[in-house]
UniProtKB/Swiss-Prot annotation:
The gene is pgk. ATP binds at K203, E325, G351, G352, D353, S354. Substrate binds at D21, F22, N23, R36, H59, L60, G61, R62, R120, R153. HAMAP family: Phosphoglyc_kinase (MF_00145). This is Phosphoglycerate kinase. Pathway: Carbohydrate degradation; glycolysis; pyruvate from D-glyceraldehyde 3-phosphate: step 2/5. It comes from Roseiflexus castenholzii (strain DSM 13941 / HLO8). It catalyses: (2R)-3-phosphoglycerate + ATP = (2R)-3-phospho-glyceroyl phosphate + ADP. One of its GO terms (cellular component) is cytosol. Monomer. GO terms for biological process: gluconeogenesis; glycolytic process.
Length: 395
């Protein structure tokens, strides 16, 4: 599904209308992590260097279709100006569409950057309202989507606007699609995926899709408990989803039929309460006493999973192996992060706690691709078409 990119456009004198993902964490009006802003810089710089005026749009937080003062993009504008000294100007607008936004866009000169106000202040954004899409399209000559993290949303700024302008991918979008789709469509083998997180119900579609593609699937986190329950193990007070046990059993059967190694924990770290100072011990999966709960994978499981990961040529990891936010139960997740860093093949991490683990351990530079979109990468792994990608012009 090759898409046109910003390299396919002659930008001289054109206005680039770029959807970016500037949904950064703020505390008291200060940005606490500017990773997402930095991720958009290669695209913005390319456009500026090639003679474009650049108009940026993004959402921030969940303002619920109204103006929320603490969710304005002013702090983002200030940070972007610091990161882009080469821009002739970095301006902010308090409008997203309408006469004020149109005037600001019209006055923008090549080499200058304009950041529109939070797209989600407008109730039409999340409704993918055609009137908003048309108003946004008035602001630019060519639409660029570089917001992979929002590509699974069909909103006015991610999907609707692409119907009314030539529409191409930015560098971040291109890199995300190349890594994730490349791994799914033509992986170097052995191809291994590691799926963690609390609930199997959130990831059934992902596991079903991957069973047709991978050589091995490693399961951890709370979702492993439901698989173990389906195998007949007593799980004590562990988080389980009894309603999903038949699905877990079916997935185990499908894996066996397809010759896929679906690996589950063989030992677990258990605790007598859900807290960092609970009593804890390591037991085989069949020996969890009543009143105790599994909160992490055990050392034997870590060894087995590490061996499979380090021997792989393509690995995708999504979701923690245990209750990563409690230090005594973070070891499994940290060990998988280390195994990923030691793997010589194509390593991809998709979203959330897995990324946090890699960054906390200072291993980010050892991973080939760290996805900026948790929800979007999950939907790609599930085999879904992302609306924000489908809307772009085919190459």
């Amino acid at each position: 599904m090759a898409k046109k990119t910003i390299r396919d456009i002659d930008w001289s004198g054109k206005r680039a209308l770029v959807r970016v993902d500037f949904n950064v964490p703020l505390e008291n009006g200060q940005i606490t992590d500017d990773t997402r802003i930095r991720a958009a810089l290669p695209t913005i710089r390319y456009l500026l260097e090639h003679g474009a005026a650049v108009i940026l749009m993004s959402h921030l937080g969940r303002p619920k279709n109204k103006v929320v003062e603490s969710m304005r993009l002013a702090p983002v504008v200030a940070r972007l100006a610091e990161l882009l000294p080469e821009a002739k100007a970095v301006k902010g607008s308090q409008a997203t569409t309408g006469p004020a936004a149109e005037a600001a866009a019209r006055d923008l000169k090549p080499g200058e950057v304009l950041v529109l106000e939070n797209t989600r202040f407008d109730p039409r954004e999340e409704a993918n309202d055609e009137s908003m899409a048309r108003e946004l399209a008035k602001l630019g000559d060519v639409y660029v989507n570089d917001a992979f993290g929002s590509a699974h949303r069909a909103h006015a700024s991610t999907e609707g606007v692409a119907r009314f302008l030539p529409a191409v991918a930015g560098f971040l979008m291109e890199a995300e699609l190349a890594a994730l789709q490349g791994a799914l469509e033509n992986p170097a083998r052995p191809f291994v995926t590691i799926i963690g997180g609390a609930k199997i119900s959130d990831k059934i579609g992902v596991i079903e899709n991957l069973l047709g593609k991978v050589d091995a699937l490693l399961i951890g986190g709370g979702m492993a408990n439901t698989f173990l329950l389906a195998q007949g193990h007593e799980m004590g007070d562990s988080l389980v989803e009894p309603d999903s046990a038949p699905i877990a059993k079916s997935l185990l059967d499908q894996a066996a039929q397809r010759g896929v190694r679906l690996m589950l924990p063989t030992d677990v770290v258990i605790a007598d309460a859900f807290s960092a100072d609970a009593n804890r011990k390591v037991v085989p999966v069949g020996e969890i006493p009543p009143g105790w709960r599994a909160l992490d994978i055990g050392p034997e499981t870590i060894r087995a999973y590490t061996e499979v990961i380090t021997g792989a040529q393509t690995v995708i990891w999504n979701g923690p192996m245990g209750v990563f936010e409690l230090a005594p139960f973070a070891e499994g997740t940290r060990a998988i992060a280390q195994a990923m860093a030691n793997c010589p093949g194509m390593t991809i991490i998709g979203g959330g706690d897995s990324v946090a683990a890699i960054e906390q351990m200072g291993l980010a530079d050892k991973i080939r691709h760290i996805s900026t979109g948790g929800g979007a990468s999950l939907e790609l792994l599930e085999g879904r078409i992302l609306p924000g990608v489908a809307a772009l012009n085919d190459a």
